């Protein structure tokens, strides 16, 4: 945190590159302006289902890769902070939706504002602070972390999370900001400035993906509704003659995998929970044993590796400081637990108190959520989107670029605004190096769901593999889903107020599933978790 403060001071004193030129829509002058929209849980292949005419037309007029890769773990809060800092979760500090900080001896829980909207957790300068420190006013609509009061300056506008908000209201909010008078216009005011950076969070696809599954009819409808929202926004921008004046960047944070009761592992069957003090994450598990000596960690690791083999590789086991894949960039931070269980995409792990796998298979009980993420960030089912159009992207229409990681988004948006970014892990410079053009309507085979596992006389599944299709996932989804609904400081705050609060809380957002998850955690690991 102290390093973050120092880096901000350095950035404030450094010189910025000349900003892009002011542009006019015929009646008003606009300084460089960029709208960044995040569609939580919008998997890359959702663009190829014939449900998104607005996004397809937008891609055809702009520039995009076939997909963008999220950062590990592919969860909402870590990735939304990566999108606005350009740093890996291990560097910016938000290493999961839920995690234990052994230095502060406190728990980060994105569903509780008092446990998440603490500036000390957020160890990097977000996009809105970078902008404000360089005189570019920012408006942030429900973006995860935007209510945490990070740094020494606040955005000009911050909208608290409201899970009941209609998509049309998001459009009205964005266009309302664009309609404010600019600095040279009559009626201009420092109290109500026209923002140049607008960042907007849209949780709908992720929320319904968890609840109904990414391949469900309901999610198809939700994808179409979100596309309709973007159609209304783009139409409003065109009506204001701002299509060639304002940059629009549409991204997502991760994809989604379908869960199945045949792809569930009972947590107690692979590890002795009496030895574990804290459990972080989900659907991946970070384990903090009471005894974290090197010898005991190796013993637990060896035992879990045997279980990994027994379960035919349906999950992987890693020691943070020994064999965590380098490409995960998931080491060198005490908030990252020392021992990890990472399921294969579509698999979930559940404690028996939350879902009895054997009983679920016997009775046909369905596990919820029906969709999950948080897996290997390079898995095709976790792929996200990036689409951009505007004066900062002067490429031929329909330009294609090579797929890239979401650490690049922060720097791209900074360049579009003409501001100097903080040091980050992105490497892309504008204009993009394009690789020709592509037709966004060209059909792409969607990634396959994981195969359904069935037990047979010749290859019986271990009892722990009986799966809770999405239920465990569901509660987590609630957890991660909340991710879908940003950990917003406001969500946390509202969660603490109870169901009578005027705004929908994150817990309400996940239909009460988080509450059951909280009881499970408390029951097993105590109130500190």
Task: Describe these PLM feature segments.
Residues 165-172, 182-185, 205-246, 413:
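A long, amphipathic alpha-helix that forms part
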Residues 339, 454-529:
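Phosphate/adenylate-binding glycine loop and adjacent helical scaffold
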Residues 45-92:
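Short, structured active-site-proximal loop/turn typified by the sulfatase FGly-forming signature C/S-X-P-X-R
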Residues 245, 252-291, 449:
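Acidic/histidine-rich catalytic neighborhood
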Residues 66-84, 141-149, 426-433:
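Short, solvent-exposed turn/loop segments enriched in Gly/Ser/Thr/Pro and often Arg
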Residues 312-336, 420-452:
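Polar, surface-exposed loop/tail segments
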Residues 280-412:
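Active-site neighborhoods of enzymes that stabilize oxyanions during catalysis
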Residues 3-8, 86-213:
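His/Asp/Glu-rich, glycine-adjacent segments
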């Amino acid at each position: 945190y102290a390093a973050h403060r120092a880096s901000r001071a350095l950035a404030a004193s450094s010189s910025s590159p000349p900003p892009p030129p002011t542009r006019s829509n015929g009646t008003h002058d606009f300084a460089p302006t960029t709208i960044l929209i995040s569609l939580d849980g919008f998997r890359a292949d959702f663009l190829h289902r014939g449900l998104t005419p607005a996004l397809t037309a937008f891609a055809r007029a702009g520039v995009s890769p076939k997909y963008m890769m999220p950062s590990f773990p592919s969860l909402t809060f870590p990735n939304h902070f990566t999108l606005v800092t350009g740093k890996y979760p291990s560097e910016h500090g938000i290493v999961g939706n839920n995690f234990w900080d052994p230095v502060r001896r406190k728990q980060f829980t994105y569903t509780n504002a008092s446990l998440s909207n603490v500036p000390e957790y957020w160890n990097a300068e977000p996009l809105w602070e970078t902008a404000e420190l360089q005189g570019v006013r920012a408006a942030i609509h429900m973006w995860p972390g935007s209510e945490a009061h990070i740094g020494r300056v606040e955005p000009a506008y911050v909208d608290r999370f409201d899970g009941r908000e209609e998509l049309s209201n998001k459009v009205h909010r964005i266009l309302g900001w664009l309609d404010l008078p600019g600095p040279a216009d009559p009626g201009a005011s420092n109290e109500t400035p026209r923002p140049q950076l607008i960042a907007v969070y849209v949780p709908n696809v992720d929320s319904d993906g968890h609840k109904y599954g990414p391949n469900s009819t309901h999610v198809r409808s939700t994808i179409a509704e979100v596309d309709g929202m973007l159609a209304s926004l783009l139409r409003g921008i065109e009506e204001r003659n701002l299509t060639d004046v304002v940059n629009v960047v549409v991204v997502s944070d991760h994809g989604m995998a379908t869960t199945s009761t045949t792809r569930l592992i009972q947590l107690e069957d692979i590890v002795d929970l009496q030895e574990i003090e804290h459990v972080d994450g989900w659907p991946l598990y970070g384990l903090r044993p009471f005894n974290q000596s090197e010898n005991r960690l190796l013993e637990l690791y060896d035992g879990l590796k045997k279980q990994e083999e027994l379960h035919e590789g349906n999950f992987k086991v890693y020691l943070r400081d020994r064999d965590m894949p380098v490409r995960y960039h998931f080491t060198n931070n005490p908030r990252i637990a020392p021992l990890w269980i990472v399921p294969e995409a579509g698999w979930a792990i559940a404690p028996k108190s939350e879902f009895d796998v054997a009983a679920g298979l016997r009775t046909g009980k369905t596990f919820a959520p029906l969709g999950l993420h948080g897996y290997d960030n390079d898995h095709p089912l976790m792929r996200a989107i990036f689409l951009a159009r505007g004066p900062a992207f002067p490429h031929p229409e329909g330009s294609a670029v090579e797929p890239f990681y979401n650490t690049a988004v922060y720097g791209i948006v900074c360049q579009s605004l003409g501001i100097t970014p903080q040091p980050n892990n992105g490497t892309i410079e504008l204009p993009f190096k394009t690789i020709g053009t592509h037709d966004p309507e060209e059909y792409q085979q969607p990634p396959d769901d994981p195969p359904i596992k069935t037990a047979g006389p010749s290859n019986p599944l271990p009892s722990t593999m009986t799966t809770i299709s999405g239920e465990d996932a569901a509660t987590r989804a609630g957890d991660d889903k909340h991710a879908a609904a940003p950990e917003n400081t406001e969500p946390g705050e509202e969660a603490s107020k109870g169901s009578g609060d005027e705004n929908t809380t994150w817990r309400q957002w996940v239909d009460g599933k988080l509450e059951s998850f909280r009881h499970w955690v408390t029951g097993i690991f105590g109130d500190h978790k």
